Curated annotation (Swiss-Prot):
The species this protein was found in: Lycosa singoriensis
Pfam families: Toxin_35
UniProt record similarity statement: Belongs to the neurotoxin 19 (CSTX) family. 07 (U7-Lctx) subfamily.
Entry's localization field: Secreted
GO CC annotations, alphabetized: extracellular region
InterPro entries: Spider_toxin_CSTX_knottin (IPR019553)
The protein, known as: U7-lycotoxin-Ls1e
Keyword hit for Nucleus: no
Signal peptide: 1-22
Length: 78
């Protein structure tokens, strides 16, 4: 009986470790990827930077990308 319980626990541990490894593999978004405001989704040394888009004075939504931390884009003067 103890052998069956220990075998079951060992299998559960192995399955859990495989699942955690699969979640960690490719879990972050690379530079230039579209992200949400969740900063944890971008890879290390990247942050999720968002800006609001306007067309002819009307807001067209918010766009977010993973960019290097500290990098800022600004509108080019026309």
């Amino acid at each position: 009986m103890k052998l069956i319980i220990l075998t079951g626990l060992a299998l559960l541990l192995i399955v859990s470790l495989i699942d955690v490894e699969a979640q960690n593999e490719g879990a972050c978004l690379p530079r230039g990827s579209v992200c949400t405001t969740n900063h944890a989704s971008c890879c290390s040394k990247l942050s999720c930077d968002c800006y609001r888009r306007f067309e002819k004075g009307v807001e067209k939504g918010q766009k977010c990308w993973c960019i290097p931390t500290g990098l800022r884009y600004s509108k080019e003067k026309e």
